[in-house]
């Protein structure tokens, strides 16, 4: 396996990628391609992966359950950007909201989860996100919001990370079958409405999930897991100029490992 990886690495480092940052690395740490992987960049909605990880920590501690029912207040319903259609004070399971975060990048779901797990406080939840980041040894990752929304909406600084830290987040997520199950879904249904995955690469070149991200400052980001020849490869692209370019760049990284 080591010899195989070396050959591939030597080949793809001659290829040009247009993303601000690109990082292709196996779950075992074998690097296939690296560009600006240490440089800070806004996470955008990739922050939702940490949101889900924190919520699942509380589930695993038996503090909450995936079957717990959560209601939306008016403030949360009105969260801008990508969202699911919900009704005031209607109950939605925690499981369905976590799925909505990963599959459809629903900002209102992310804020509802944050308020529920944070016992009514978004700030408390974001501190849990940062506490987990520190515990994971992520020295270049800071969260200010539970969903990765831009300053123009939140009035907070941008959530930031770099490709190497995002690799660690993805590797951690790989150990949780719930995240892999949810992020691999091509669609979900919430309250009778169908929502199609934001990940248009699902099923191509071994793509089995994980999370896209976008706002006007971060541009188009993606944290992907591709199972290639039985090995999980984590491909990270940050700062692409369009959604289409993002998916092409991701496929190019995957193709050069397959």
Indicate where each model-derived feature is located.
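Catalytic-site microenvironment of enzymes
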Residues: 4-5, 32, 255-258
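Sec-dependent N-terminal signal peptides
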Residues: 4-13
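A periodicity- and composition-biased signal for non-globular, repetitive helical segments
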Residues: 8-9, 54, 217
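Generic marker of residues within folded, mature protein domains
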Residues: 13, 33, 60-62, 216, ...
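Active-site-adjacent loops and short helices of periplasmic peptidoglycan-processing enzymes
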Residues: 17-164, 174
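Penicillin-recognizing serine hydrolase domain
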Residues: 19-28, 94, 118-258
